[in-house]
Amino acid sequence: VSKTRMIPEGSDAISPAPHHDIYSIEDLRQLVYSIKEATDYKKPVIVKVAAVHNIAAIASGIARSGADIIAIDGYRGGTGAAPTKIRDNVGIPIELALAAVDSRLRDEGIRNSVSLIAGGSIRSSSDVVKAIALGADACYIGTAALVAMGCHLCRSCQSGRCNWGIATQRPDLTKRLDPDEAYGRLVNLLRAWQREIKELMGGMGINSIEALTGNRLMLRGVGLTEKELDILGIYHAGE
């Protein structure tokens, strides 16, 4: 990392959020097609963005740039190296962002031109089902996978002293992680989620993920404001 980033060992690695080569849809489009040409149009181009207040407009621009997939990361997503105040207070919940993006792309008639992948606070199979029903084509996980592998959520990934040997290069710590055991735990997690998702879908009378995608009639809100329900496109529980 020190060599690649040209940062002296022991120094803070400051990674600013802005991409100073992207200030418009045209700039993004140029980058997207540069990547497509470099990969001979054989690899999908994914643009990942944080869930923020104007995410619907941002996603619309990404879809028009020619990207194949939009990955949306809800607040509380990210690495264990992120400052706690930033992780817990910056951004908006993935549910609101996802619903807003799906509705915007459908209204503009470009929903089928791009896939939506959701992440950030996806902690269980029920979170996956809710995300799919709100418009996601798929979900991705980070922290949930790490926990399955043995992560204790110490939130000190940047220190190089991960006591489970996951986020470190120190030989005395990496030897604590058994890759085969970690692999088995992760496989168990995903297989359990798969079974639970099937059970939840069966309870809703749905027999395929495709039939669940964007099917908000399957969802109801509890303890949500009228504005939140409007953005999510769902009814109060009991309605």
Predicted feature descriptions by range:
Residues V1, I122, E196-E199:
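Hydrophobic alpha-helical context, especially transmembrane and signal-peptide helices
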Residues V1-I14:
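ATP-dependent carboxylate/acyl-activation modules
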Residues E9, T143, L190-W193:
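Hydrophobic alpha-helical segments, principally membrane-spanning helices and signal/leader peptides
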Residues I14, H19-T174:
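Glycine-rich phosphate/ribose-binding loops and adjacent secondary-structure elements
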Residues P179-E239:
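C-terminal extensions of enzymes
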